[in-house]
């Protein structure tokens, strides 16, 4: 970290969701280097220095670095969880759940295969329903007690393609999904470099396409896509895909494809993926508000 600009270092440490956000933190006087106030976004950060941010929202830091990723994606792709019943698939320490709560979610079902990982301030929130020891692949509306309005997911060491049938099956007809695609878990072992970092743009594009293609098989269409505000801790680039049910391609249980359904993404979806992954810019469907034919 020696010699890094303060705004760059704050972003790299997961204390800010973008360079602009980092600069704002510094300008507001909330950045600290080894406990001392730092006032210049361009100022150097000594090697080994401890970075902190004070006076964070609600008086407490987010439950994880990943929280900043979802926070940025909700802004970037213009999604609002206020008043919604949400599912956090792969909740871990609760970073995504934390963001949803702070943004006004009515209730969050936090599902993870592990146990006792949620940060205390997340676990103790009355709006959180903890489902430890639960596989995302096994989820059903009956298990959750209701269909959900919004699904968010941050999963590791598993392809989103393996859980999409379950996730598509638990959303309400008006529901939406915001899933973080991690190419290193989508390209397959044979295509993954020894470093574990997917650097080939074509491979990253194909990773996202694979997720969106599986989503289409479940009756979901790509509404928007954008890059994560932060890279993975290993340096992998990650992407958020916003999916919603298509009225002409309805979700169906257990991955069963409805006879006669169009089960592949349209040309616009592939164009959105190529532009967002290749150009690192958000893309939204042009016909977002146009009525669909049944």
Residue ranges and their predicted role:
Residues 1-49, 85:
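A basic, amphipathic helix-loop patch mediating RNA/tRNA/ribosome contacts
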């Amino acid at each position: 970290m020696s010699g890094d600009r303060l705004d760059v270092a704050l972003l790299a440490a997961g204390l800010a969701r973008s360079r602009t956000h980092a600069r704002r933190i510094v300008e507001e006087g909330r950045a600290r280097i080894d406990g001392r106030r730092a006032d210049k976004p361009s100022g150097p950060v000594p090697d080994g220095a401890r970075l902190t941010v004070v006076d964070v929202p609600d008086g407490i830091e987010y439950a994880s670095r990943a929280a900043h990723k979802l926070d940025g994606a909700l802004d970037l792709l213009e999604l609002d969880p206020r008043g919604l019943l949400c599912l956090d698939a792969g909740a871990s320490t609760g970073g995504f759940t934390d963001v949803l709560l702070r943004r006004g979610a009515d209730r969050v079902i936090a599902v993870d295969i592990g146990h006792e990982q949620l940060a205390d301030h997340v676990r103790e929130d009355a709006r959180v329903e903890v489902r430890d020891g639960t596989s995302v692949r096994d989820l059903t509306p009956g298990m959750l007690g209701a269909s959900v309005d919004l699904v968010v997911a941050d999963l590791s060491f598993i392809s989103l393609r393996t859980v999409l049938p379950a996730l598509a099956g638990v959303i309400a007809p008006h529901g939406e999904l915001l899933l973080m695609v991690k190419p290193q878990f989508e390209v397959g072992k044979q295509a993954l470099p020894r470093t574990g970092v997917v650097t080939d743009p074509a491979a990253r594009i194909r990773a996202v396409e694979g997720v969106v293609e599986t989503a289409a098989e479940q009756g979901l269409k790509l509404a928007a896509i954008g890059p994560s505000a932060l890279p993975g801790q290993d340096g992998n680039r990650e992407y958020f895909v916003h999916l919603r049910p298509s009225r002409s391609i309805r979700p169906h249980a257990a991955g069963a494809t409805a006879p006669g359904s169009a089960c592949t993404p349209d040309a616009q979806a592939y164009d959105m993926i190529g532009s967002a992954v290749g150009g690192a810019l958000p893309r939204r469907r042009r016909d977002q508000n146009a009525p669909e034919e049944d």
